[in-house]
Amino acid sequence: MNALSTQSPETEVSAETIGALINLSGRQRMLSQRIVLQLLLASRGDATALDIARKCLSTFESAHSDLVTGNERFPGTFSGALQQLYFGSARADARIREFIARVRTAIDAPLADTSRQASSLDVLVTQATPILELLQTVTQAYQEEMHRCELAVRKRQTDLVDRLSGISMQANIVAMNARISAARAGEYGREFSVITQVLADIIKEMDQLIRHVVGSSDAPKGPTRA
């Protein structure tokens, strides 16, 4: 089945969630290499290596499902770019599942069947670098999603600043006209003058809010860690 033909619309995801996805996808790189290493150690007689490889595979497979399908915390392939990476020409989902199947074959190979063990292990060793490169591409894709998320947040902040600036300018004009009218009214305009002063104070607070929003959006961001 072509998953791209039934792909879901893009979902807005928070920077916090994308950060967790970056960490999860980054851990997949480490697990893939650890699995191969433990299977090599098992082939040389390490009594605990096979169990470690089996646990690593379980974690790896579960994490892949979380990344692609999603769960109560993660949204799955929430963007067109991720859907294309996993289910398009790059075939990331299929290739990762093939790696999982090959690992399971190597783990389940009978100890007495040394030729089958050696064959399945040779295939995994050959695939160690390509799968690492693929998982690196996946991690980079999530990092790009983080960059897009940050750009969207900054745009919303900029739009908010523009709206507040427009309101502040209009309010300043109203306040200035009100002061002129109060001055012309003489003694009768004193009460109105108090109201214009309150309006001026509100405008001042609004200007401070605008500066705060601008300062927050211009604050330097630390590098995203995988």
Q: What are the residue ranges of the model-derived segments?
A:
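Heptad-repeat alpha-helical coiled-coil/4-helix-bundle sensor or tether segments in soluble regions
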Residues: 57-115
